[in-house]
Regions:
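Exposed beta-strand and adjacent loop surfaces of beta-rich binding modules
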Residues: 11, 30-32, 51, 90, ...
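Short, surface-exposed interaction patches in beta-rich subdomains
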Residues: 138-223
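Active-site alpha-helical segments that house and flank conserved acidic catalytic motifs
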Residues: 14-15, 93, 111, 146, ...
Length: 223
C-alpha cells in the first residue's frame, strides 16, 4: 500500500492486464493505492501484482503493469487495484479484461476495456468504450460518448451536454433530472423506443441524447 499527499484532485491513469479496478473518491487530502493479486493462491496473479508499478508525479498518479520479460508465457494474471483519492479527480483506464468501479464523485472519465463491467456513481464528462459488458453511470454531469458492442447501457441521471449511447446488442436506459430540458434522437432495429422525457424544447435543450441499438429497447424518462 502506498500513500501520496494530494491536497487537490489528481489525474489517475490505470493500465492493467486483467482483474478489477476500484476508485473511491471522497473529500480527502491524500491518495492511497492498494495492489493485490486477484487470487493469492495463483502464482500468475501474484506475479501480475508484483509487476504493477505505482508512481505519482506533478498531480498524475500512474498504476500500470510493467511489460513481462517473456510475453509468450501464457496468461498474464489478474490483479485487484483499489485507489482512494480526492473527489473530482480525473480517471483514465485501459485494460483487456477487468471490471472498473468508481465510487463517489469523479471528474472527467475515460475507460477503454475489451471485456468487463463498468460502473460509476458520478462523473463529469465521460468516454466509456467496451467490446463486451454492461456500463452504468449514476449521475452524468457532462457530455459523453458511451458504447459497447454487446451489453446494456444505463444512465440514471444525465444533466447537460451531448450524450451519445450505442450498443449492438442490448438495452439502453437513460434518465434526466426533473429540471433538465432534453431532446432524444433514438433508433433500434429490433426493439422499442419509450420516450418519457417531459421537458423537450428542441434545439435550445440543455441536454441532447442520441441512443442507438441494433437489438434492444431504448427507454428515456424524466426522473
Amino acid at each position: 500500500m502506498q500513500t501520496f499527499a494530494t491536497p487537490a484532485p489528481v489525474a489517475a491513469v490505470f493500465g492493467i492486464p486483467a482483474g478489477r479496478v476500484q476508485i473511491i473518491a471522497a473529500e480527502r487530502a491524500d491518495t492511497v493505492v492498494d495492489v493485490r493479486p486477484a487470487d493469492a493462491g495463483k502464482s500468475r496473479d501474484v506475479r501480475a501484482a508484483e509487476r504493477i508499478q505505482v508512481t505519482f508525479h506533478e498531480g498524475v498518479l500512474r498504476v500500470a503493469a510493467a511489460e513481462p520479460a517473456n510475453r509468450f508465457l501464457g496468461s498474464s494474471g489478474s490483479v485487484e487495484v483499489t485507489v482512494q483519492l480526492p473527489a473530482g479527480s480525473r480517471v483514465e483506464a485501459t485494460t483487456a479484461a477487468a471490471d472498473v468501479r468508481g465510487v463517489g464523485r469523479l471528474g472527467d472519465v475515460t475507460v477503454d476495456v475489451a471485456q468487463g463491467t463498468v460502473k460509476f456513481d458520478e462523473t463529469a464528462a465521460a468516454r466509456l468504450t467496451l467490446q463486451a459488458g454492461d456500463i452504468t453511470v449514476g449521475r452524468l454531469g457532462g457530455s459523453a460518448e458511451i458504447s459497447t458492442q454487446k451489453g446494456h447501457l444505463r444512465i440514471d441521471e444525465a444533466v447537460t451536454g451531448a450524450v451519445t449511447l450505442s450498443t449492438q446488442q442490448g438495452d439502453i436506459t437513460v434518465g434526466t433530472a426533473p429540471e433538465t430540458s432534453a431532446t432524444l434522437d433514438a433508433g433500434t432495429a429490433y426493439g422499442r423506443v419509450h420516450n418519457g422525457l417531459r421537458n423537450t424544447v428542441g434545439a435550445s435543450a440543455a441536454l441532447t441524447i442520441r441512443a442507438t441499438t441494433a437489438h434492444g429497447d431504448i427507454t428515456a424518462r424524466t426522473r
